[in-house]
């Protein structure tokens, strides 16, 4: 996991959110790039000679029989793409609501057309219907998340086998539009998308981001904001670290003391907080609408002081420890031989599993210093059985790889571990190497937020590695995906989190999505430079990493995305 061994023993003073620092240009000259899409598509050909122009006549259309999920994506596209307005100071209105085509009709000119399609034919999702052939300029790649984006001067077509692919194709279209669409400023000119084709699908199924809301609490609205930013970069797993020594952050109805006591504070002694089950369910729904699966983590048997202070019977001596507001680790553990411990674990897994439609439950399992190895192995294997009883697949940090895991369980590696043994038994691995993707590490020695026990992690360090060759004995077939955690020892406000998360999360998103052959540091840094204005338009408090040529990158070779009237 995070934090641990090399961090100081006392809680740090709360650091005010840093103001965005002045852009610092890298020494390298500007690099011309054909597009600024992140993650890099599997294949993209964009022409400089022509473009599709969005204006007041543009409409979003879907097939007559398109399911509700497709209509939802179409509504998101219509809401995102503004109609140009010539009225200074007024926000640009969205496109009209999408409309359904009549059966058998072709999409009209001047339209953005979303269609479920396989092998060049539109897919009728009704069980009693046969596929309706519609001429297609491109077929989407296979897989639920693949898509094809085809732009002509007359039409934009996004085709995909499943609604998730349409959603990701819409994010690519979004990034081909100018950053001004993000804040809906007055656009007294027409918007243009370069003509060309994109065929794209993810390399890995799991492209994750972890928020530690236990050490410092984040309000539901702040979590939703991170979900929105994840969607922009095609990330699809939100791992919520919901319990630790410093706080318990989700209501458990059978154990109300967990939030009444354990949710009452955080690092530094602040007021803490927690999510009601209704708020958590709302977060899950909000994320699902953006094709993000929520993965809950309740750390056990260590990192449990908030639970031990709430329910003394979970301690082997039955005593109540004080609430903890520092950042040390390893001093707490559930009593592994207590029947009360296992009633508690069952209650938590049962209630949270019922609230979480995704297939995973994360038990933590890291940094256990108070149990013998035999006790630890017994705990993990028994917890695994409870997780399976409630229909979920167990995930645990690196340390669980030393136990007899079921092949359906997943190891999330953060340090060198025994994952190769789990892979040899048919198990899968999530790669979260601390020295590469722990976003709570400082960028450099001058960074005011974050820690450095795993080293300094600049943007290139987060980007420049290949998951398939990273861990001996763990090949690409055994890798479920990659995930970037941000631990919150030094983070108090949403702006603090954003400062350490961006732009490194965009780098990790490309590691997880793009084929290795489509990746390269020089091209990435050039594309990332063009995301500065987009992140600014979204109000993100991102770090102006000096290795990125913010403001220097040459304009795309494709036509300028904003075309005067």
Describe these PLM feature segments.
Residues 14, 18-204, 485, 496, ...:
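Contiguous, structured surface segment used for ligand recognition
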Residues 404-407, 415-565:
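Flexible, acidic glycine-rich loops studded with aromatic residues
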């Amino acid at each position: 996991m995070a934090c641990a061994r090399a961090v100081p023993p006392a809680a740090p003073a709360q650091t005010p959110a840093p103001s965005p620092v002045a852009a610092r240009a890298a020494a390298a000259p500007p690099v011309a790039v054909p597009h600024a899409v992140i993650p890099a598509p599997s294949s993209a050909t964009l022409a400089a000679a022509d473009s599709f122009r969005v204006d007041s006549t543009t409409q979003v259309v879907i097939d007559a029989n398109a399911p509700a999920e497709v209509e939802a994506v179409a509504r998101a596209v219509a809401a995102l793409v503004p109609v140009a307005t010539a009225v200074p100071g007024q926000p640009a209105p969205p496109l009209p609501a999408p409309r359904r085509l009549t059966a058998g009709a072709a999409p009209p000119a001047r339209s953005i057309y979303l269609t479920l399609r396989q092998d060049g034919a539109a897919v009728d999702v009704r069980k009693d219907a046969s596929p309706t052939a519609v001429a297609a300029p491109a077929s989407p790649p296979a897989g639920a998340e693949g898509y094809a984006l085809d732009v002509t001067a007359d039409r934009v077509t996004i085709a995909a086998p499943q609604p998730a692919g349409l959603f990701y194709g819409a994010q690519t279209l979004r990034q081909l539009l100018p950053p001004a669409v993000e804040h809906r400023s007055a656009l007294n000119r027409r918007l243009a998308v370069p003509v060309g084709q994109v065929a794209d699908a993810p390399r890995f199924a799991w492209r994750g981001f972890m928020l530690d809301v236990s050490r410092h609490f984040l309000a539901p609205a702040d979590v939703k904001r991170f979900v929105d930013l994840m969607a922009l970069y095609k990330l699809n797993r939100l791992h919520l670290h919901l319990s630790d020594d410093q706080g318990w952050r989700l209501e458990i109805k059978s154990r109300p003391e967990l939030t009444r006591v354990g949710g009452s504070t955080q690092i530094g002694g602040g007021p803490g907080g927690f999510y009601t089950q209704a708020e958590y369910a709302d977060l899950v729904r909000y994320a699902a609408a953006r094709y993000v699966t929520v993965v809950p983590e309740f750390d056990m048997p260590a990192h449990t002081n908030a639970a031990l202070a709430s329910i003394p019977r979970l301690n082997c001596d039955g005593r109540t420890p004080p609430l903890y507001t520092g950042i040390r680790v390893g001093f707490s553990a559930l009593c592994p031989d207590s029947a009360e411990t296992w009633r508690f674990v069952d209650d938590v897994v049962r209630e949270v599993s019922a609230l979480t439609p995704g297939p995973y439950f994360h038990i933590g399992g890291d940094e256990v210093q108070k149990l013998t190895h035999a006790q630890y192995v017994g705990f993990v294997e028994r917890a695994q059985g409870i997780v399976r009883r409630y229909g979920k697949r167990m995930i645990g940090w690196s340390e669980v790889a030393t136990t007899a895991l079921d092949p359906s369980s997943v190891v999330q590696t953060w340090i060198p571990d025994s994952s190769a043994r789990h892979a040899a038994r048919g198990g899968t691995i999530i790669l979260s190497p601390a020295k590469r993707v722990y976003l709570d590490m400082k960028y450099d020695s001058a960074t005011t937020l974050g820690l450095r026990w795993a080293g300094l992690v600049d943007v290139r360090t987060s980007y420049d590695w290949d998951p398939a060759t990273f861990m001996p004995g763990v090949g690409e077939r055994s890798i479920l995906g990659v995930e970037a955690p941000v631990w919150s020892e030094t983070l108090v406000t949403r702006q603090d989190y954003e400062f350490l998360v961006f732009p490194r999360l965009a780098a990790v998103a490309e590691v997880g999505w793009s084929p290795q052959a489509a990746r390269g540091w020089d091209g990435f840094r050039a594309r990332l430079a063009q995301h500065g204005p987009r992140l600014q338009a979204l109000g993100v408090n991102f770090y102006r990493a000096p290795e990125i040529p913010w403001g220097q990158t040459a304009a795309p070779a494709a036509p300028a995305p904003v075309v005067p009237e």
